[in-house]
């Protein structure tokens, strides 16, 4: 019959500390999850139809210079993407 040796499991107070630290870790994780869920719950919500209407209104009222096929050609004086011309005669590099 084989001989079984007893295992040294260590100091019982150390085992208790490890279990306590694991419990503290679980509690902290649950608390953080609870806080995130509370923040989600407090976030303002609007119906999808209202959000879609708001986006459509914005797109119809805001001129997009990158889509000239919809808004027509952009006058040079209004083009924000046109390189700015310097008023001086010299450029220092």
From Swiss-Prot:
Tell me how this protein sits in the membrane.
Peripheral membrane protein
- Location in or out of the cell: Membrane
Q: Know the name of this protein?
A: Guanine nucleotide-binding protein subunit gamma
Residues with the Cysteine methyl ester modification: 90
Q: Which GO terms describe its molecular function?
A: G-protein beta-subunit binding
* Pfam families in UniProt: G-gamma (PF00631)
Q: Which UniProt keywords are present, listed alphabetically?
A: Lipoprotein, Membrane, Methylation, Palmitate, Prenylation, Transducer
Which Gene Ontology terms of cellular component type are present?
heterotrimeric G-protein complex
Q: Propeptide positions, renumbered to this chain?
A: 91-93
Q: Does this UniProt record's set of keywords contain Membrane?
A: yes
The region called Disordered is annotated at: 1-22
Per the UniProt entry, what is one GO biological process? G protein-coupled receptor signaling pathway
- What PANTHER family does the annotation carry? GUANINE NUCLEOTIDE-BINDING PROTEIN SUBUNIT GAMMA
State the similarity comment.
Belongs to the G protein gamma family.
| Residues where lipid is bound covalently (S-farnesyl cysteine) | 90
The subunit structure is:
G proteins are composed of 3 units, alpha, beta and gamma.
Q: Where is the lipid attached (S-palmitoyl cysteine)?
A: 89
Origin organism is Neurospora crassa (strain ATCC 24698 / 74-OR23-1A / CBS 708.71 / DSM 1257 / FGSC 987)
Under PROSITE patterns, the record lists: G_PROTEIN_GAMMA
Please verify whether the record's keywords include Lipoprotein.
Answer: yes
User: Encoded by which gene?
Assistant: gng-1
């Amino acid at each position: 019959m084989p001989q079984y040796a007893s295992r040294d499991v260590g100091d019982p107070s150390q085992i208790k500390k490890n279990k306590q630290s694991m419990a503290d870790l679980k509690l902290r994780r649950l608390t953080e999850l609870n806080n995130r869920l509370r923040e989600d719950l407090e976030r303002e919500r609007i119906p999808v139809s209202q959000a879609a209407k708001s986006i459509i209104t914005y797109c119809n009222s805001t001129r997009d210079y990158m889509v000239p096929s919809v808004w027509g050609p952009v006058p040079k004086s209004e083009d924000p993407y046109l390189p700015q011309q310097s008023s001086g005669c010299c450029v220092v590099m």
